Structure formats: C-alpha cells, structure tokens
Amino acid sequence: METTELIEIIGRDKDSKHQFKANVTNETSLAQEMVAFSNSGGGAIFIGVSNDGTFAGLTREDMGRLNQLVSNAASQQVRPPINPQTENIATPDGLVIRIVVPTGVSKPYMDKNGVIWVKSAGDKRKATSREEIQRLYQSAGLIHGDEIPVPGLNIADLDIDYFKVFFERNFSESLDDQDLPLPVLLGNMNLMENGIFNVSGALLFARNPSLRLPVFITKAIAFPGKEIHETDYVDSQDITGKIADVFQKSIGFVLGNIRHIQGDQGVNAPGEPEIPKIALEELIANALIHRDYFVSAPVRILLFSDRVEIISPGHLPNDLTIENIKMGNSNIRNPILASYATKILPYRGIGSGIIRALKEYPDIDFVDDHDGNRFIVTVWRKVPHV
C-alpha cells in the first residue's frame, strides 16, 4: 500500500472495514478485533495511527514485536485460528503495520473465552441475540433459515387441496395413491420434521403461515410524494398467506398503484404499466425467496411518486456483491424454499433474475446495506410528460 492511499483511508476515519490503533500490547484486545472482522466481512487494522489521524511513529523494533503479537493472537486467541496478512508501510513520521483480516469461512469465530464479536459501524460488540448467532452459522452454510421448525404449525395446518394440485402437477402421481402418511411424505420432501412444518413448508403450503410467522409477511404502502409520511398514504396493505399468494398480491399492489401508459395502443386498450410486470416479478420473487429468515422483519414494498423500493431483510450473503448479482452470480440462502419456488413462482433459481429485470427495465439501483442488514432495490418510475 502506498502512503498516499493510507492517508486517504485515514482521512475517511474508522468504519466497519478499517480500524486504527496507535500501538498494541494486548493480544486479547487485538484478537477480539480480528474475530469481529472475521465474522463481519473482513477488514484491515492499522497499527501506528492515532485516533486523531496522526502517525504514532513506530520503529523497526516495534514491527518485529507487533508481527509476533499478531501471529500469536491469530493462532492462539481466535477460535478457530485465522491467517491474517501483514504489511509494513513506511511514512515520513514512522512505520505503520496493516493487518488484513479476510472474511471468515468458518463462522462464527470466537475469542479464547468463547465470546463472538462482530463489527457495528466503526466499533465492535458482542453478538448475543439468538438470531444474530444463527445468521453467522447460516453464512457458513451450517444451518439455513428456511429449515427452522415452526412450533404450532402441523399437519392440521396444511392446505390439502392446494398441496394435492401441486403434488399431482409436479410428480405426475395422485396424492391419494401414496402409501406414506402425509407427515412422513412432507418430511421426505424436507418440508416437515416430526410432524412440525419448517419455515419452507409453512410458507409454501400452510393455509395461514402468518399465524405463527407474523413477521414473514409483506408490508406494502403507497405514499403520495417522494418521502415516507407518518399519517398520509394512498394505499396500504399487510400481505399475508402462502408465498404464492403473497407474490401475486404484491405484484397486484404495485401494478394497481403505478401509472399505465397508452403508448402505441388504441384508446380502449388498458395500457402498459410504466414498470414492466416481468421486472417486478423478478425483483419481488427474489425478495421473498432470498430474504434472511433469521431476521424478524417483513419484506417492505414502498411506492413513492418517483420510485418503488423493495426492501428485503438481510444483506447479500457471504462475499456476494451487487456487481456479482448483475452478472448472474448467486448464493442461495434458502435452498429448500428456492428448490420449490421454481415450481410455484416465475423463478428459475439460476441467478438470472436480476439480469432479466435489468434487461426489461434498466433504471434500477441496488444497495447492499450491511449496517442496516437489508438489501434495497430502487426502481425509478418514469416521469410523466406534462
């Protein structure tokens, strides 16, 4: 790293990717910082930079001691051990050591006392909530939010008529001809365990999944202007039901609250929506299928006079970036739900949804909000000609 680049980073102050320390003598404290970065997407620790942005003036002797301290902290104080990279940077006011901590592949990482640390903006904190710890296991592929049991939803909650149609259409067999009891059959389909629906099974086939999963719904609101208003809205709906119903109702809500344009059609034609339906289908399907089901929050669809926002709980998983998804890369967060969604929704499961949405309607922005733990899609509406 060049000194000019280091100065630019220092000028931006610490954040969730950069930490500054004048000097370090405590292995335990350094290990906690490493754990937090390993659990939170990686980052860099700069030793030799004071809180006010000035250089602390480290010497060659300091470099030897600090490199040994980094090695000891990473191998003996972090569980499982990690392998950070170090770089010594020369400045006119002394040396700086940069410690690069990659995002971990064996989350959750802990300190030697079993404490899980994560980054929170420019600081670190202990991860204590069950949901947060579950998300760390999820990011390592050890558990998935869609396979968690839903106590209180059992075989009596199955929408049997809907399931029969699905089963016969996709397996070319009559459900009535199956020798297995329904709980066993649903268990074999990874939708139920010990007679209890998991999240996937409930969202796909329960009559009223929101009975036990009240936050896994879609909240849709249309506002009259460009900002959220506390009391004034044009339309508002809490959309509940099976995921297929939520999908269709969500599409209907957006289409019912945006303009329809005549274009080249005759005067009696219904007009085409200003945002193509195909683009909306891809974006809303992605929101429902790929949201983080360890986050107790609904999908939100917010309509404004100039845009439509689709906000999904959970930022992009692991190392996935906005640039990646625009190129068709994917990381399936909810594999059971995604496998059945290909049979129920206009969803292919091959990472092409964002590409198709952009092809149909390029005026779409994406924000991967790690601090807010959400993914925001903004579809800009066409300005009407006056």
Sequence positions of predicted segments:
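Glycine-rich/acidic phosphate-handling loop/turn and adjacent ATP-lid/helix
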Residues: 308-344, 383-386
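Generic beta-strand structural signal
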Residues: 49, 90-92, 213, 303, ...
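Polybasic/polar functional segments that serve as interface/processing modules
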Residues: 1-45, 49-98, 104-107, 274
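Active-site helix-to-loop segments that bind/position phosphate- or nucleotide-bearing substrates
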Residues: 120-284, 288-295, 303-305, 317-331, ...
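Structural motif
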Residues: 44, 54, 307-309, 365, ...
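Intrinsically disordered, low-complexity regulatory tails
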Residues: 81-154, 294-298, 344, 348-351, ...
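A short beta-strand->alpha-helix segment at the C-terminal rim
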Residues: 356-360
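Flexible glycine-/small-residue-rich
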Residues: 100-103, 207, 222, 303, ...
